[in-house]
Amino acid sequence: VDVVTLDINPQVNAHLTQAKQAARRGRPYTIQLPRDPQVRWNPDFIAYWRSFGDQVGVPATPARVPPALAGLQIRAVRVQPEVVARIEPVDLNIVVQRLALDANREGFDLIVATNILVYYDAFEQGLALANLTRMLRPGGLLLSNNAVPEVPGMGIRSVGYRTTVYSDRPDDGDHIVWYQKIASRNER
């Protein structure tokens, strides 16, 4: 699996580039996953938290919890260097740009766009959706936690929706919508 990240934040891109360079030298990347035990988390969320990263890494020693956050639980996962080395960070604004696809890449099978589209108005969301659609292969999927208006003729349609609840707090959850690129006549 290749992972291409698209971000306009130079700090995010620099961080990912440094992690990739370190991975090429054989160094793993450690992810710290905090969880507040005072919150009544959904059992499925806790099971997910306990197993996150198991397919690409191994448990690691978590960071020390600062005294001000006493009680916070942290799970750490050391991601294998060969996984991190497959990340390709790209500086790209999905509203006004799209990734140029070469002959070796017909488009992505999956694009995950969470906590992104919410920052744009309806017009910008439409532009972003058009660019994301062009980057998908025919039949490819886009997952978002922000429903966007579908524009007839854009070549993408909503194919599913799910609400995911993390805890008993009212704002702890997401509404995941998935869209599928419709193959155009010349792509069939």
Where are these regions (language model features)?
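Class I S-adenosyl-L-methionine-dependent methyltransferase module
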Residues: 1-96
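A short glycine-rich, Lys/Arg-flanked "PGG" loop and its adjoining helix->strand segment in the class I
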Residues: 125-138
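Short aromatic-enriched loop/helix-cap "lid" or pocket-rim segments at secondary-structure transitions
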Residues: 15-19, 102, 155-157
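A short acidic, Gly/Pro-enriched loop at the edge of an enzyme's catalytic core
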Residues: 92-111
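Short, charged/polar "capping" segments at the starts of alpha-helices
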Residues: 12-14, 150-153
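A short SAM/SAH-binding and catalytic strip from SAM-dependent methyltransferases
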Residues: 108-123
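Core SAM-dependent methyltransferase catalytic element
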Residues: 155-188
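Conserved beta-strand signature within the Rossmann-like core of class I S-adenosyl-L-methionine
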Residues: 5-7, 110, 136-148
